[in-house]
From Swiss-Prot:
It comes from Ovophis okinavensis. This is NADH-ubiquinone oxidoreductase chain 4. Keywords: Electron transport, Membrane, Mitochondrion, NAD, Respiratory chain, Translocase, Transmembrane, Transmembrane helix, Transport, Ubiquinone. It is a multi-pass membrane protein. InterPro entries: NADH_UbQ_OxRdtase, ND/Mrp_TM. It catalyses: a ubiquinone + NADH + 5 H(+)(in) = a ubiquinol + NAD(+) + 4 H(+)(out). It is found in: Mitochondrion membrane.
Length: 231
């Protein structure tokens, strides 16, 4: 069920990060050097999840692994225990909550018309559903964290906090973000570009679907314009 996937990616997955933030506040203050193994594990987990995204052929699985990779960055930022790290983690959880939920919604829109989630079989939708292609482009750009979205602000805060703590982490962060851009563009090009494989009659997108995506995009744009609301 797509509603379950949207709630899972947008809310339940982020509750773990929120729980870690609350736990870190009640734990006694310790040197961040003790958290180095967890930091490396979180960043390495983010890279592995990103690499898993690259080899996915199932659209829904790709978006799910994308959510997991972003949570690796969130955990790494929380562990540092700096104001920038916590602000970046909170902002990324909120921003990616909207983004991943919108991506799942778009994946369902595609599935309802093609009856498959295989990337190669869903291509050529830009000729059939041009407005849905626009939504795909916007959400993928937000997933990549292009400015001036909230995703960009949050990842910039996380990168700054991690680089200030240990400059070597920029290698893992840079690799993670490069792979994120690769699979996001791959997902967009695979589902939208090319020629459609089926000649079946496809019904146009409904107003309810546009409304659903708009209700994801508008709060994200508002938070991007006024980040003081959450940072």
């Amino acid at each position: 069920p797509i509603a379950g996937s949207m709630v899972l990616a947008a809310i339940l997955l982020k509750l773990g990060g929120y729980g870690i933030i609350r736990m870190m506040q009640i734990l006694p203050t310790t040197k961040t050097d003790l958290f180095l193994p967890f930091m490396v594990l979180a960043l390495w987990g983010a890279i592995l999840a990103n690499l898993t995204c690259l080899q996915q052929t199932d659209l829904k699985s790709l978006i799910a692994y994308s959510s997991i990779s972003h949570m690796g960055l969130v955990v790494a930022a929380i562990i540092i225990q700096t104001p920038w790290g916590l602000s970046g983690a909170m902002a990324l959880m909120i921003a990616h909550g909207f983004t991943s939920s919108a991506l799942f919604c778009l994946a369902n829109t595609t599935y309802e018309r093609t009856h498959t989630r295989i990337l190669i079989l869903t291509r050529g939708l830009h000729n059939i559903l041009p407005m849905a292609t626009t939504w795909w482009l916007l959400t993928n750009l937000m997933n990549i964290a292009t400015p001036p979205t909230m995703n960009f602000t949050s990842e910039l805060l996380i990168m700054s906090a991690l680089f200030n703590w240990c400059p070597t982490t920029i290698i893992m962060l840079g690799l993670s973000m490069l792979i994120t851009a690769s699979y996001s563009l791959h997902m967009f090009l695979s589902t939208q570009m090319g020629s459609a494989l089926t000649n079946n009659q496809t019904e146009p997108t409904h107003s309810r679907e546009h409304l659903l995506i708009t209700l994801h995009i508008i709060p994200l744009v508002m938070v991007s314009l006024k980040p003081e609301l959450i940072i």
